[in-house]
Amino acid sequence: MKIRIAARGSKLSRIQVDMLGEKLKKIGIEYEIIDIKTKADLFSTEPLSKLGKGVFEKEVNEAVLEGKADIAVHSMKDILSEINPSLEIFAVLERDPPYDILIAEKNLDKLDSNITIGTSSIRRKNFLKYIKPEINTKDIRGNVDTRIRKYLSKEYQGLILAEASLKRLNMTMNYHRLNVYDFTPEANQGIIVALGRKKDEKIKEIFKEINHKDTLDEALAERAVISLVGGGCHSPIGVLFKKEGKEFYGIASYSDGKKKITVSISKPGDPYTIGSELGLLLKKEMKNEDIIP
């Protein structure tokens, strides 16, 4: 059997598909890749905030819905909190490091004033502005290779990226991992997800064999927070859960650049209930501080 996998055509996306494909091969399933151009690819110089929601996923998911592919593979942080009702999460791979990293000559505490850090994430911009208001941020688009090239050419004095992307690309640059209390990661950062048609029971059963249950539980808890509070790649909300045994450890943060709220939770239970509880805690504190997302 050969499974058709739809994904973006970027180098990082190809690597992510191959990571999932290797899991399939181990259970005797072959795969082929169907390259899809998304809105984010077609307007690669535009700020993400101007492109709307779902810019990394919509066209890829449509290929599955239209029967041109069996599975859509994404970096899970790029998919909306509300998935198309005809699609379903079939599997996630074991999570890579979920952290944000700073690529710069110095660590965050020792950065000079009035330098320019490259990031297109409103979450990262606001967290940085809260901690280091004297540092400038500037939008940066393009794949990871392009962004690093701009940094090396001194167009930027630093970059904030996801650690998982450097790991998957096998890049060996020096970087500084950012503390999760200062830079709480985007929901589902570091997770590769496979989406399929809800009615496709045969393929759904195949993907159960490669699903990493603890990672999925972490992902669902984080998505419950975002569903309650509102968020995604255009929102200054970070959330991270770690599951150890039956215990969930969660942290969620919001910043408008002037104020910052961080809440946490630690308890056993099911992902949706615990994620919702953390989301309600965050909403309550945001209301107390008169912050509206």
Curated annotation (Swiss-Prot):
Please tell me which top-level EC class this enzyme sits in.
transferase
Enumerate the PROSITE patterns for this protein: PORPHOBILINOGEN_DEAM
GO BP term, pick one: protoporphyrinogen IX biosynthetic process
**Is the keyword Repressor assigned to this protein?**
no
Q: Where, per the database record, does this protein carry S-(dipyrrolylmethanemethyl)cysteine? A: C233
User: Protein biosynthesis: present as a keyword of the record?
Assistant: no
Task: Give the reactions, separated by semicolons, that this protein catalyses.
Answer: 4 porphobilinogen + H2O = hydroxymethylbilane + 4 NH4(+)
Which is one Gene Ontology cellular component term of this protein? cytoplasm
Cofactor stoichiometry and binding?
Answer: Binds 1 dipyrromethane group covalently.
A Gene Ontology molecular function term of the record: hydroxymethylbilane synthase activity
- SUPFAM superfamilies, alphabetically? Periplasmic binding protein-like II, Porphobilinogen deaminase (hydroxymethylbilane synthase), C-terminal domain
Q: Which family does it belong to?
A: Belongs to the HMBS family.
* PANTHER family the UniProt entry points to: PORPHOBILINOGEN DEAMINASE
Further remarks about this protein from its record: The porphobilinogen subunits are added to the dipyrromethane group.
Q: What is the designated name of this protein?
A: Probable porphobilinogen deaminase
